[in-house]
Structure formats: structure tokens, C-alpha cells
Amino acid sequence: MKRKAEKQQSAAPVSAFAARKARQQAQIAATPEPVKPPSAVETTEEPPSKKARTSPEEDTPSQSVSPADRVQTRRSSRRKAEPSEIEKTPRRKTKTTPATPPEHLTDGTVGRESGIQTPVEEVSEPEGNDVPLDDADRYESPADTPALVEAFPLSKTRLNKSNIVYSDEHTLCVRIKEKLSLVVIGHYDVWVKRGVISLMGAKLHPSPRLYRVYAPSTHSLPVIKCVSGVDGAAEVEIKSCHSGIYRLRDLSPLYQRIWNGSNTSADKLTLKNAEPHARRTFSVLYTSTDDSLKRHLRPLHLEKQWSSAIKSLSQKGGKLRALICGPKGSGKSTFSRYLLNHLLSPAPQTEPSYCNTDGVAFLDLDPGQPEFAPMGQIYLAHLRSPVFGPPFSHPSLEGSQDGTVIRAHHIGASSPKDDPDHYVLAATDLMDRYRALLASYPQCPLIINYPGWIFGLGLEVATWLVRSLGLSDVIYMSEKGPAEVVEPLGQAAAAARIPLTTLPSQPTDFVSRSSAQLRSMQMQSYFHMTRPADVSTPLWLDQPMSRTRPFKVHYAGPHQGIRGIMVMGSQIHPDLLHEALDGSLVGVVAVESPNAILGHSEVPGLANGVMGKQPSPAEEGSEDAVMDEATEMVPTAPLASIDSGITRSPHEDLPYLFVGAGSCNPLDPKASHCLGLALVRSVNVAARQLELVTPIAASRIRDALQQGYGIVLVRGQLDNPNWALSEEYYAARAAEKRHRRFVDSSRKDKVDDGTDDSAHTSAILKDRIRRASHVPWMTVIEDNSRRQREAAQREKSLWKLRKKAYPGSESEGDW
């Protein structure tokens, strides 16, 4: 059982058992006589009271529980009785005002049978907090501790008659004075009419172009700041846009309550001449208390050291080759995005020596949270225009006018730690593609985003990349070390004769979505986004995956469309391939050569395989193997043929591709590339067909086949697509609620709504909800009050030990 201790900067973290034993000894020594009422001095030496996550039942009287409930909570009550005298006084002395109880659990809860639950939220519900973390995703964060929503200042500009140029129900044009700013939540288009503004690192000048901005509450809000202008002010038009991304709230509660809520005071001022119920897709916020949904909103401000570093790096122009690394949650992605936008839109007044016409190359080596691709991929992208929004607003660049993905490789996991050899080979191949890109765009700088895998084996990979990729700069996003990371990076940078810049981290104070939830949001956005040929911006469709028309691909017979099905990781029996494939996410990989599988190395491992040499006897006993800088990046064995590795499953005749001993050897990055992801909706054994749902354009697959490439489906270790299983249920609930609203509105306005037809429609919609709730691998809990009470009791009875990510770190996590 864990206990929670206060986070102390000076003391090193201790185990829960040691902390408990120390407290027991102190209690025995301090209380030889019967316990007396403790004084104020004594309370300071005792463990702090638990700041538990609030629940609707927290303030309700305790209810009698059944024997079954007592069995589940017996362990908690026994642990709680032990320090009863210790707990009473701290709970009286330390008073915290609880946050507003979340009221998102309205009708039911849907989740996987494994115990992962997804809360059911009403779309128009104005109260409550953001979507809570699932049981599998719960963690201690600063978001758990604040009691009230702080009145945090957002905008430095107050709208009035003098700075409002014009406004209507769709558009707002304002003047922003120099060094003042405006914060807007929602999604909108920005048109700079006069002056120069800064937005997420980009400096935008007057032009006829509109820039699409996505500013949800899941991330810090972009700040529109006037840099210079005519008569000391810039004139900016902000216009509502209808991309359809808000429709995803009907498919997942993770997309609910992330855009603008009711009209703010600034909105009401600018909508005086509009219809009474007019609403834009954005809202102007002066402070965080202006938000009707009472969320913890913060502006996206940069540290001065960040701004100086971005300006210094931008001055290198086309010679820039920067690797950005650091611990998890230190702001690597934010810094990369700001640097990218700054390079794509330099200010001519301050940087006359550099004019970017060749774009910027973005090498994303983070398969867990990629910027322009779905999870599980690393890629090289060529950007030509700044981007304004979180990753789930641009999960793919396919068909985009702002940039293209030059080449991508499927890692098949959110972390490269399971197969670092393949990861390094893929990164090296992408770097070779960048060098080839320089032939067409010689002044194209490069930004490399490295994942938070910076300790242990990840540090070895990072130092190898620093020595091998021909970089110009290395940026480490933490001033607090640790030394065992910074020193090897500094030595590698010194060996490569490049500077190592250390910047302060900029972690998020409040977290409304966990990393797993953000990955689900990005994956869901990826599968629902489309780019029509005649539209310059993406659109999102709210049709559930179960109602999307799939691609039907033959996996056997004369019209076989795929060469094989590969399962990364440990070998499985061919009889289990059907179960492993059905309902999973797979990478669609184009194989450029029949011999595209890396051969099996007799001495596996990172230091012995691709990146290092054979260790000496003295090195074999050490934990950290020494890497050989001169080792050439080549496979350790000849490539194997795909056809020779095919084994047909006995019942379904599926082409199981496996080469290796114990674990499957991956595809060679130099002879293959990833086209995207697909969801295997079903396996039609009778027709020997796979039903695939994928956003990959049919023209890309057709072009790959016309070039003689084979298609291989790679089943990796990506997160289960739980969001796809529950989409139909949430869509059915949203449709039923819209119908209920329509009926209520008709009755209120005394309009004949056709009672018989309404009742019939309502019955059909309720039946749709009933059928959608019977999806396999999903359980709908209609009454979850008991579950909430049990969870609240568990939270109150637990003391969690909060550990630092590393010595001197302000963030928390596994160390």
C-alpha cells in the first residue's frame, strides 16, 4: 500500500515501506503514554493529509455498504485504523477548498472489459471539470492539487469601441497596440491586415492569406501579440471557421469541452448587433475566469532564454541542423514548434540576411507523440508554412499545401526501446533522405525532435546521433540535469565540435488530458480527417468507424493484394494470427525490394548489433557498453527474402510473415517505407479478404503497386483502438440527445412536431443505443454511483509516494 509524502526538493525520494516504518518508530517513541490532543507543533511533524481527487460523493453522508463492499474495502479500513490519531489533527489543521465536483458521469460509463472506463459526458453540460483520467491512466500531477480556478490574466488588451474596427456574428476585426496581446480560445482564421503580429513563434505580415488556428483548452492558448504596426497598432481580423473538428465530440468524450463555451463579456460586446443566440467558433478571454466552463486556462508564453535561443538558431539559416532533446514533459515539442514557425516566417525587419524560400525539414524521432503523423511512426517532413495548433489538429500532411512527408517508417510502438537497432537504422535512413533533399532545397534547415527517452539506452542512442548525423547544434531542455545525462551529451557534442545549449524546461502546470488520452485523440483525428481536392484546409467527418465503407483487400488467391502480415515482437503461432489481427491497428508498409527483411544477428543488442562493435571481455562485465563511433550503419547479416518467410495460417490461409529466432526481424528501412495506418475491421475468411479502414489515399496505394512495390501489414504494439469500439455508442447517444432537444424546443415554441413521428424516431434512436452498447470488448455501466463511491473510498485511504523524475527535477514520474 502506497503512502503520499510531500514533495521536498532537498530530500531524496524513499520507498513507501521505509517511510511507513520511520513514521511508526517515531510514533512509538513520541507516544509512550496515552495519546493526548496534539499541539500545533506536533502536527507539523506528521504526514500531510491526502489531497484527494474530488468526487460527487465526497460531501454526501456515508451510506451503509453491503458485505461485498466491505470485502473490497476491508484492506483500506484496516490500514486507516492504524494511524487514526495521526490523521485526525492534520485533516483539521490543513483545510483545502475542494474543487467543483465533476458531473460528467450523466447516464452511464463505457469501457473495455479489462476495466478501462470512459466517462459519458453530455455535450452541452456547462458544469464540471474536464474529462477525468481513466483508471489505467491515473497519475499524480499538479492538476490534482488546485482547489479553485485561479483568475489568471490572459489578454493584455481590453476590447472597446476604439479598438473594435468591425464585428458581426462570424467576424471580429480589432486593433492591437504594440507589445499588447489578445488570447482567443476555439478555432478560427487569422488575417493580418496591417502591422506585424507574433503567433506561436511566427511573425505574420500583412498579406491576403488566412492562417488557420486551433486553440483548444487541452494545451496552452496561443497569444496574438502586436510586434509593430501602423500608428503603433496592428489590425487583425479573426473569423469563425467550420472544419468539423468540433463534431468529434459526438464520437468521444475526450473531444468534449475543449473549445469555447458560452459567449464571454468580450463576445457579448462585439455581438450587440447580431442575433440573440449568435455564437462564433472562438471567444476572446481577458482572464481564465471568463471561461464559462471554468477550466484551468493558461497562455502560451515563452521564457526569455527560449526566445533568445530561437533567435540565435534562426540566424544560422540554411546551415541549421538542430537536435532537440530532454526529459519527458520538458517542452521539447513546444520549442520545436516555435522554432519551426519562426524559421518559416522570419521578420525581414530584424533578420534581413535570411529569407526562407526552401522551407524547413522536420525530422520527428518521437514515435509516441509525433507532430505530423500518427503514433508509432518516425518521419521526415518538409514544411513550407507555419502551423498553429496541437498535433491532433494536423495528424497527417497527406494532401496538405503546407508541407509533405518525404518518408516515414513504422516503429510499431510508442517507444523505440524494444528495438533500438531498427530505430537507429530508420533514423539514419531519414537523415540520408534529408541530405538528398538538399540537392533540390540547398537552404533548407533541419529540426530533429528526439523523444523523452533520454535515460539509459536512450542516452546511448542520443549520443550516437549527436556524433553521427552532422549536426550544428544540440539543445537540451532542462537546466537541472541530471549530470549523468548532460555530461555524456556534452562529451558527444564536443567530439562532434558542436555547441550544447541548455535551456530551462517549461512543463505544463495543469493537465486535463493524459499522454495516453492525447494519443487517442490524435489517432481518432487521423482516421476522421479528410482533405478534399478543392479545399485548402482539412475537414473532419463525424461518421463512426463502424459505418465507414472499408477497403476490401484479398490476402490469398489470384488477386492477392498484400504480400504478408508481420507481427512485431515475439513470435506467435499462426493459429493466433486471426485473433491478433482482428480489430487492431496495423502499419501499411510499401516494400521496395523482395529482400527487404533485416537478417538475424548472431549477437543481438544495441551495443553489439547496429551501433556498436563486439565487446571485449573487459567490457562484457560492465552495464554500459561503449559504442564505436566508427561503426558503419549497415545490417549485421544479409537481407532475407519475404516470400521465403511466409507461413500460411491453417484455418484462414493468412500470409504470416516471420523471419528470425524468437522475435520477428523488422523490415529494412532502406528498402521499405510506411504509407500510413489502417484499422482491421474484420477478416472475411470465406472470401479471403481483409476489411481495412484507412485514411490513406487510394492513389498512394495504387502508385506503390504500379512501381512494383509489395504491401505488407505490420502489427505492432500500439495502443488498442478503444476509441473506435465506443464511437457508435457515443454517436447514438448524441443523435438521441439532439432529437430530444428538438422535441423540447418544438413544445416550448408550441410547434406541431408530429407526436407520433417523434415517438417513433425516439424509439429507433433508443434501440440504436441499446444495440451499440452490446459491442464486443466493451461494457456499458448504466449506474456507476456505487463504482464512484468505491473509487472515492480507495482514494481517501491511499497515501501515494510522489517521486521525482530525476534528482533536482520539478516534475514527477518514474525514476
From Swiss-Prot:
Its EC number is 2.7.1.-. It is found in: Nucleus, Nucleolus. ATP binds at residues 326-333. Keywords: ATP-binding, Kinase, Nucleotide-binding, Nucleus, rRNA processing, Transferase. It is an enzyme of class 2 (transferase). Residues 122-134 have a biased composition (Acidic residues). It comes from the Eukaryota. One of its GO terms (biological process) is rRNA processing. The keyword Mitochondrion does not apply. GO terms for molecular function: ATP binding; polynucleotide 5'-hydroxyl-kinase activity. Residues 16-30 have a biased composition (Low complexity). GO terms for cellular component: nucleolus. Pfam families: CLP1_P (PF16575). Residues 1-141 are annotated as: Disordered. PANTHER family: CLEAVAGE/POLYADENYLATION FACTOR IA SUBUNIT CLP1P (PTHR12755), POLYNUCLEOTIDE 5'-HYDROXYL-KINASE NOL9 (PTHR12755:SF3). Belongs to the Clp1 family. NOL9/GRC3 subfamily. Polynucleotide 5'-kinase involved in rRNA processing. This is Polynucleotide 5'-hydroxyl-kinase grc3. It comes from Aspergillus terreus (strain NIH 2624 / FGSC A1156). The gene is grc3.
